[in-house]
């Protein structure tokens, strides 16, 4: 499937997952989400939690466009590198929300209230020498 050249491009991240989202006006009546060349439902193995992470941004924009009587659908072409499926879905949500803000700047308060514009900076802590894991120490013996 060829990707159109016009549209909005934004990136997002979570843990070690990095995402690049290209948002393009849809040529047909329905919008589609393509992740690494596959439909989102196939890529995320029909997992409702991961799909809901992504679709919440789409739902907010859909409701807002109905209120403003705008009938524009968008296709999302997404490239994901690294991380697990959960981190990838959260990174996609962040990048999608950033993309939709380019088109609908008045949605910032909606996305901000729900925490969709904040990158979760928590990552795995590194292992320290002398310890078994990041914080787990070997058993201590007094005698």
Where are the language model's segments positioned?
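Basic, glycine/proline-rich low-complexity segments that contact nucleic acids
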Residues: 86-89, 93, 97-143
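Contiguous, often N-terminal, cationic amphipathic patches that form binding interfaces
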Residues: 1-74, 126-143
């Amino acid at each position: 499937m060829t990707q159109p050249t016009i549209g909005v491009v934004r990136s997002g991240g979570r843990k070690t997952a990095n995402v690049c989202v290209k948002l393009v006006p849809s040529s047909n009546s329905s919008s589609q989400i393509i992740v690494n060349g596959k439909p989102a439902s196939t890529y995320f193995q029909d997992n409702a939690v991961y799909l809901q992470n992504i679709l919440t941004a789409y739902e907010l924009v859909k409701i807002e466009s109905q209120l403003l009587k705008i009938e524009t659908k968008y296709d999302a072409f997404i490239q994901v590198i690294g991380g697990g499926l959960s981190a990838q879905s959260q990174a996609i949500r962040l990048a999608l929300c950033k993309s939709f803000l380019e088109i609908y700047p008045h949605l910032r308060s909606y996305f901000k209230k729900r925490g969709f514009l904040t990158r979760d900076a928590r990552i795995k802590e590194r292992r320290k020498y002398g310890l078994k894991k990041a914080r787990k120490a070997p058993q201590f013996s007094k005698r």
